[in-house]
């Protein structure tokens, strides 16, 4: 209910203490018996009554309803509390027919509950307090039906967003090739790596001969000039710098050392032969 109904109630019924009000408690109030609102937490009353006299007559209710505390603070409606009345009312004092119909219309206009809850509430206004357990069962059944309807509606509405999402994904995938074609970077010759494939198998199954470029050969000759043997760390550095594998660097240095030994042997032999001829 809204504050509009509360204000209209105070205007139509000057003597608010002579009429009984609805007991708006937490969900735990649906237990067949009614709690005393005076002992409940002030946050259970979701509206500020602006100093209205909401004192309920204890003599007519037989002790089931207590006096509503006037210092109840006004809190915003919380989703945890059901705003629909969770209990039935005992038969109040005779009310003029015009006032009863007006209050019923205000309830139907301002109540956010479904028609089943409204019918239950209107029926509870005319029944005795002994039917509280019966209305509790109706409330539970109504809540269960509401959850089932919400599940069906969410399941049915979820198919449409899925279809839209799939359609958007298809559009995105179809538009990506065109954007990739337009944004293909230009690759210059100096950006290409040499000897990327290090497979050592040729067309006949034998190890393929490595063709070194002039730049690679020059760098390897410089390194061999300073040191004929390489450490593993230095071999890894040269392999990364020349875009070669460690195995290729190791084989090149082995071959280069063999060639160097052969050249030195030939030089020594030529010196020996030349010296012997000079002495003769």
From Swiss-Prot:
Gene3D superfamilies: Homeodomain-like. Residues 117-133, 162-185 have a biased composition (Polar residues). Transmembrane segments: none annotated. One of its GO terms (cellular component) is nucleus. It is found in: Nucleus. The keyword DNA-binding applies. Keywords: Developmental protein, DNA-binding, Homeobox, Nucleus, Transcription, Transcription regulation. InterPro entries: Antp_homeobox (IPR050296), HD (IPR001356), HD_metazoa (IPR020479), Homeobox_antennapedia (IPR017995), Homeobox_Antennapedia_CS (IPR001827), Homeobox_CS (IPR017970), Homeodomain-like_sf (IPR009057). GO terms for biological process: anterior/posterior pattern specification. Residues 79-185 are annotated as: Disordered. A motif (Antp-type hexapeptide) lies at residues 187-192. Residues 205-264 bind DNA. GO terms for molecular function: DNA-binding transcription factor activity, RNA polymerase II-specific; RNA polymerase II cis-regulatory region sequence-specific DNA binding. Sequence-specific transcription factor which is part of a developmental regulatory system that provides cells with specific positional identities on the anterior-posterior axis. PANTHER family: HOMEOBOX PROTEIN HOX (PTHR45659), HOMEOBOX PROTEIN HOX-B5 (PTHR45659:SF2). Belongs to the Antp homeobox family. This is Homeobox protein Hox-B5b. The gene is hoxb5b.
